[in-house]
Amino acid sequence: MAATTAAVVAEEDTELRDLLVQTLENSGVLNRIKAELRAAVFLALEEQEKVEVKILVEFLIDNCFEIFGENIRTRSRITSDDSLEHTDSSDVSTLQNDSAYDSNDPDVEPTSGAASPNRQLEGPTPTMAGLDTRGHRDTCESSSESSVSMVVRLKNSIVQQDRRFSEPNMSPSRECLVGPTSKQKLTRSEDSFTLSQDASCSEGDEAEDPFTEEVFPAVDSKPKRPVDLKIKNWTQGLASPQGHITKAFSRSSPGESLGSSPVPSPSCPKRNFFTRHQSFTTKTDKTKPQREIRKHSMLFSFASHKKVLPRTSSIGSEKSKDFSRDQLQKDLRKESQLSGRIVQENESEIQSQTSLGFSLSGTWALSVDNTFQLVDMRKPGSPPSYEEAIYYQTSGLTAYGGQTVGSMRSRMFKPSTAVPPVPSHHGGDLSEGTPGGHRLSSVTEHWTHSQTVHVSIETQGRSELHQLRTVSESMQKAKLDCLGPQHSHLVFEADQLCCARESYI
């Protein structure tokens, strides 16, 4: 039973498979038949269209003079131009005004383009007479070759037309080209700005010109630029290719180059545009000094991306004369009263050091290391040297866990202290003064050591805020190299000042 069932299923599968194969084959055959039928239908339609077109052409050839008359050439030309321009054939003047090269000036008279159709209407030409005889001779023939040749002849006679009619504003003579374009107005932005024809007319019109040539230099209206045009110096005897010089060329200085007055493309002689303004050109006035010219083209901006602003000693020397010593001492004393010891140092205070006898370079930058070296150079013994400030800051440590800022300040400012305090890398307030500057007198010369030094240098019109620098950056190199004490002054460590800073806050 199971075997018979399996046999039936196998037969059904084979039948289905055969049916699918036949369906696929039939679909392919149908597609091929459809393509062939479609191609045959297209060919039949094309043949029918060809026959109809041939019959229509033969009818037009046989009855052309009865339909169009004897002046078929002029009529066909007008209709072809109207079909191209999409205008009315009754008004021929619209073809002239629609031209892109025409001017809006009503004073400019239209050229001989409107008269050209009237010239063509004088009568049948010899070509048309020959066409008439050929037409009557070929109508008797019934072959397709004769009809095709007649169509070609008729097409050539119709298409052959005067270029001056299709472009009515292109005048044939050179006098008509030079005359209207030289007197033509530039109607872009100023109607009173005209172009002169020659050098004599330009000399007479200088008083009537509302604009100077420096603002709007005139452009020579020549129809074609010479190939070998190389102009180095403009002189009074130099002439343009048409024999006349415009106002810009007659009044230009001998040292100016050709690039000072750019000339537009001479491809269309009917249109003249304004050239660039003087501020966009590279022409420089020789009478003005160079510094006055660069004042308008240069922005004096000082953008410094470094951490430390470089200083110029010339600026500081001028400001140090006007800055009084009393004002400097008063500002430093006011800043030293702050508990955080944040020093705000402007450019005048920095540059006042140049008047003390230090030889500073033009790009000397302020830093903690340079400050220690500068002070140690001026007074070698007091305050302590740069090496002592770095190497012996950890000597003589004592437990000061219960100290406050006030008690440490009173301890540091005792008159029994012989040596000024050595800077610590993390202290809160240990002494007076600024790390970057020293007092002008030996009595008021002190030190200020803080966690950070906040330098704000005010320049002309702007102030740059520099990043915070810690004193510990300059002291981490040789901190543990030498710990031998050479003096008995007490210094504070960072862990000893935690309670002091917290109590103050």
Curated annotation (Swiss-Prot):
It comes from the Eukaryota. Residues 283-292, 318-336 have a biased composition (Basic and acidic residues). Residues 90-102 have a biased composition (Polar residues). Residues 250-262 have a biased composition (Low complexity). Residues 203-212 have a biased composition (Acidic residues). Residues 81-147, 160-212, 242-293, 311-339, 414-441 are annotated as: Disordered. PANTHER family: T-CELL ACTIVATION RHO GTPASE ACTIVATING PROTEIN-RELATED, T-CELL ACTIVATION RHO GTPASE-ACTIVATING PROTEIN. This is T-cell activation GTPase-activating protein 1. It comes from Mus musculus. The lineage of its organism: Eukaryota, Metazoa, Chordata, Craniata, Vertebrata. The gene is Tagap1.
